Structure formats: C-alpha cells, structure tokens
C-alpha cells in the first residue's frame, strides 16, 4: 500500500513524502513507524503467527522501520534491527548520524560506534587533501598523516564541525569521542561491501583496540 507520496509542491529533502489521506501514521517505541488505514494490510495470508507479530490489538501495523514525523512529512531513518542500543538502554540510529556528519567537506567515511557502549563514538576517515590544506594554512608541521591527525588543532577542527552538525540529535545520540584514521576503510580488509557499505562487525573487529581506547576513563 502507498503510505506517502510527493506532491507537486512542498517537497522536503530527506522526506519520503506526505502522508496519504486514508493512512494513519504514528511513531511507536524505538521510533518505529506504525501504520493503520483502509489500504494497510490486515494480515499475512495463512500466516497467523506472522500477522499477530506484525499487527497489534489496536490494528497498528508494525513496519520494523525507524523514522519520525515532521508536520505531515514522513522521514525514514533505518531498520529497527540496525539500531544500536547503548549500555544505558538508549537507542541510536547510526545511519542517520553518519549521513548527517558525512555531508561535512572534511569527512570522507565515518563509522558510528555505540552498541552496548556507554556513549556514542566514531571512527572517521578524513578527506586527507582538505586536512593537508588546513595544516598549511595554520602552519602545522608534521612528518606523516598519522601525526597530523593527532595534532590538537586538527582534532579541534573536527570537534567543532561535528558539534555543529549534530545539534539536531538528542544528547545521548551525539558523538562524544572520535578517532581520525590515517587510512580509509577498504574492501580488501573486508570493511566494505562491493557497494561500499560498511560491514560493521568487521570494522568493530579490525579497530577494536582503537575503539576500546575511546571508552577508557
């Protein structure tokens, strides 16, 4: 069933469209998108258990997708199963945060870390050319990229830019600590799929030492 669509006007970047007239939408636990209406399925054919799992007693269909409403516009963030749950019980949408931060000209790749952790952190692959330009502008001397990325001025630059971009997120969703990587994520090390999507378990394994260091007191 069609839940939302784009009209000839009122288009919002990032939205999946305006809610259709005959469809009810609400946001449930874990920011799950719930649907109800004449065009929404009443159940799965000859699959009573699947129907009971998907449709609650009030008739709301549980999509398994996380998102939010802004006026009459619907925004989809990601699948519920892809959400991270911090050790404090808060749910974090890694893709939403990564997408937002990746618009920065200094950030090439980013991996959000939060699952079963006390707070959100990030592994960041900078756009090395822009960082070199910044170093030249600020008169920063360095022997190699690893040394440059540990310079206080460079770290301060990324801290300020990240904080500006993540203002729209709740405090518990925001990146508290980050590490700048001297090499990009790669398919050769199994960190990316052939469509360049992150393989999170592989990234977590390959960078375990760096990740653990960000959570040291």
For every predicted segment, state its role.
Residues 1-13, 47-50, 128:
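Active-site loops of AMP-binding adenylate-forming
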Residues 19-86, 114:
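Conserved ATP-binding/catalytic segment of the ANL
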Residues 109-112, 118, 159-217:
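Conserved C-terminal "lid"/linker of ANL adenylate-forming enzymes
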Residues 58, 104, 169:
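Acidic-histidine catalytic/liganding microenvironments
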Residues 40, 73-102, 131-151, 171-175, ...:
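Adenylate-forming
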Residues 1-8, 20-22, 92, 117-119:
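Conserved A3 ("GATE") glycine/threonine-rich loop of ANL adenylate-forming enzymes
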């Amino acid at each position: 069933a069609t839940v939302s669509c784009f009209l000839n006007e009122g288009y919002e970047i990032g939205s999946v469209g305006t809610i259709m007239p005959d469809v009810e939408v609400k946001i449930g636990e874990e920011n799950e998108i719930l649907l109800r209406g004449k065009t929404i399925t009443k159940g799965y054919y000859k699959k009573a258990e699947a129907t009971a799992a998907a449709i609650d007693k009030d008739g709301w269909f549980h999509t398994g997708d996380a998102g939010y409403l802004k006026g009459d516009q619907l925004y989809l963030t990601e699948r519920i199963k892809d959400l991270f749950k911090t050790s404090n019980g808060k749910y974090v949408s890694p893709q939403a945060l990564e997408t937002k931060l990746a618009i920065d000209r200094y950030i090439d790749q980013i991996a959000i870390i939060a699952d079963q952790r006390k707070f959100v952190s990030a592994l960041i692959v900078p756009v090395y050319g822009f960082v070199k330009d910044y170093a030249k502008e600020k008169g920063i001397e360095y022997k190699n990229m690893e040394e440059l990325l540990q310079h206080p001025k460079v770290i301060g630059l990324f801290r300020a830019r990240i904080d500006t971009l993540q203002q729209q997120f709740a405090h518990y969703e925001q990146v508290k600590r980050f590490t700048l990587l001297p090499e990009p994520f790669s398919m050769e090390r199994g960190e990316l799929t052939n469509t360049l999507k992150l393989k999170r378990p592989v990234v977590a394994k390959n960078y375990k030492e760096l990740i653990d260091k960000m959570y040291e007191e």
